[in-house]
């Protein structure tokens, strides 16, 4: 039973069969509202029906065994005196708003609740964007030290940047549009708050764009470092091969089993040959060092 004397908020997990059945059977909703609250679409969306608004907003996923960029859809049906929201996975933002209500300092109207939930979703998104920013700074410091970061770390951060931006961009437009809707239950203070939230989302989007650009530069630097390391190893192997090439030639030449090889009858010929190889290797090393090849 929904109280009629004051604004009410009903929050459901539509993955629960009982909640889904209630949403399908309640006379409070029309077919469009049911489809919105139970549908599969996850993109931010705003549909106005008179003084009623249907919203789909997205929040950062903090659930265990899920990645943050797998954003959670919060579906909202809101009227001047009634709010119905549903989601499949929990959101910290909804808990923030609920906690404020429990403490007695939360929303007192549908408009206040709408501003608070948009604000909470934006704050949580901003926290995650700042975390990504810090991770990029850490990678930049590693690369500046001419070291290679852990394999796949940059690719994961870049993917998160792109996916978060994919949902925050339409959500920014949605909040700005919501502030301009001529709804009787939204006053000027509420509209200013929503426009401020849209502006904060725009700043987070700018940070995400900058993060994508910086990650591209980092990828180039990491590729350059990898190429340099590969070239350095190949060069070292080439120098080693150059040093052993004369020795390989001489050992092959003197190793043939033919008569008339110089020193074949001398007991000291082997040591003389080893000394000659050592002198040749030393001379070649000095020459390479002089030519700055080594």
Residue ranges of model-derived segments:
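Long amphipathic alpha-helical coiled-coil segments
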Residues: 179-191, 216-227
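Peripheral, non-transmembrane regulatory/ligand-interaction domains of membrane transport proteins
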Residues: 1-187, 196, 200-203, 207-210, ...
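Hydrophobic alpha-helical transmembrane segments and their immediately adjacent juxtamembrane loops
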Residues: 202-294
């Amino acid at each position: 039973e929904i109280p009629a004397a004051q604004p009410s908020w009903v929050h459901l997990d539509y993955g629960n069969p009982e909640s889904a059945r209630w949403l399908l059977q309640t006379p409070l909703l029309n077919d469009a509202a049911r489809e919105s609250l139970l549908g599969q679409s996850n993109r931010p969306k705003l549909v106005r029906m008179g003084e009623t608004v249907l919203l789909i907003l997205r929040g950062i996923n903090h659930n265990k065994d899920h990645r943050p960029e797998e954003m959670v859809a919060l579906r909202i049906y809101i009227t001047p005196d009634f709010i119905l929201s549903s989601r499949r996975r929990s959101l910290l933002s909804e808990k923030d708003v609920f906690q404020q209500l429990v403490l007695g300092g939360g929303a007192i109207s549908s408009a206040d609740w709408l501003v608070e939930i948009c604000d909470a979703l934006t704050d949580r998104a901003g926290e995650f964007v700042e975390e990504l920013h810090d991770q990029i700074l850490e990678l930049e410091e590693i690369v500046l030290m001419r070291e290679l970061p852990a394999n796949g770390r940059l690719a994961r951060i870049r993917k998160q940047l792109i996916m978060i931006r994919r949902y925050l961009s339409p959500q920014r437009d949605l909040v700005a549009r919501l502030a301009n809707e001529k709804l009787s239950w939204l006053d000027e203070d509420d509209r200013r708050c929503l426009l401020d939230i849209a502006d904060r989302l725009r700043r987070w989007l700018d940070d995400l764009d900058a993060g994508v650009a910086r990650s591209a530069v980092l990828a180039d630097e990491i590729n350059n470092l990898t190429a340099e390391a590969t070239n350095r190893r190949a060069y070292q192997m080439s120098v080693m091969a150059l040093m052993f090439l004369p020795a390989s030639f001489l050992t092959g030449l003197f190793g043939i089993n033919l008569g008339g090889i110089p020193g074949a009858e001398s007991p000291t010929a082997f040591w003389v040959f080893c000394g000659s190889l050592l002198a040749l290797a030393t001379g070649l090393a000095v020459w390479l060092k002089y030519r700055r090849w080594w």
